[in-house]
C-alpha cells in the first residue's frame, strides 16, 4: 500500500523580528547625524502587519526606507514580503509612506504556484490550495524534493516557506 507524502507552502514573517527591526531602525535614526533635528518616525502596527513611516522630506524618506530594509535583512525578515506603498505628501515638505507585510499567500499567487507545479509535469504530484497555504502531495518523497527545488528557483514575488513535511 502506497502512502502519500506531503508538505505545505506558506509565507510570512516573524512579527517579533519585525518589531526588533523597527526598534533598531528607530534607534539608528535617533543617533544618525543626517537625522538630527528631524521629525522622522517609524510606527509598527502588529494587528494590521504594517509599518508607517513619516519623514521631513523625500531624501530622508528614502534613507529611512533603506535603513528599515537593512535592519529587516539583518534580522532575517524576508524583504520580498514587504510592499512599500506610495509616498503621500503631508503638510509642508513632510511625506508619509506605509510598508505592508505579506503574512499569507494570496489566492492569485497560490493559483500561480499550483499552475507552475502542474505545468512542469511532475509525476503523480498534486497541488491544492488550503486557505492561505498550498499543500503538495505525492507518493514519492523524491518528487516532493524535486518540487521544492523547482519552487526555490521560481520567483512568485514572495518568500516561500516549506513546512509540515509528512512522509
Kindly give the residue locations of the regions a language model identified.
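Short, conserved charged micro-motifs
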Residues: 16-18, 59-64, 105-109, 143-144
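Helix-adjacent hinge/juxtasegments
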Residues: 60-98
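Short, hydrophobic beta-strand segments
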Residues: 5-11, 48-55, 92-101
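Short edge beta-strands and adjacent turn/loop segments
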Residues: 36-47
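Short glycine/threonine-rich beta-strand-turn micro-motifs
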Residues: 45-58, 130-139
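N-terminal, positively charged regions that mediate nucleic acid binding
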Residues: 1-37
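Positively charged, low-complexity, intrinsically disordered RNA-binding extensions
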Residues: 3, 7, 96-167
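Short amphipathic alpha-helix segments
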Residues: 19-34, 68-69, 106-118
Amino acid at each position: 500500500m502506497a502512502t502519500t507524502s506531503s508538505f505545505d507552502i506558506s509565507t510570512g514573517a516573524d512579527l517579533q523580528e519585525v518589531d526588533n527591526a523597527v526598534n533598531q531602525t528607530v534607534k539608528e535614526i535617533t543617533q544618525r547625524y543626517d537625522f538630527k533635528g528631524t521629525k522622522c518616525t517609524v510606527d509598527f502596527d502588529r494587528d494590521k502587519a504594517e509599518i508607517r513611516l513619516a519623514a521631513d522630506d523625500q531624501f530622508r524618506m528614502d534613507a529611512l526606507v533603506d535603513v528599515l530594509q537593512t535592519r529587516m535583512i539583518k534580522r532575517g525578515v524576508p524583504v520580498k514580503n514587504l510592499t512599500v506603498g506610495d509616498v503621500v505628501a503631508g503638510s509642508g515638505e513632510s511625506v508619509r509612506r506605509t510598508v505592508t507585510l505579506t503574512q499569507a499567500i494570496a489566492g492569485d499567487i497560490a493559483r500561480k504556484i499550483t499552475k507552475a507545479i502542474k505545468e512542469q509535469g511532475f509525476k503523480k504530484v498534486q497541488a491544492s490550495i488550503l486557505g492561505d497555504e498550498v499543500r503538495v502531495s505525492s507518493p514519492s518523497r523524491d518528487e516532493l524534493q524535486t518540487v521544492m527545488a523547482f519552487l526555490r528557483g521560481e520567483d512568485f514575488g514572495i518568500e516561500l516557506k516549506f513546512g509540515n513535511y509528512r512522509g
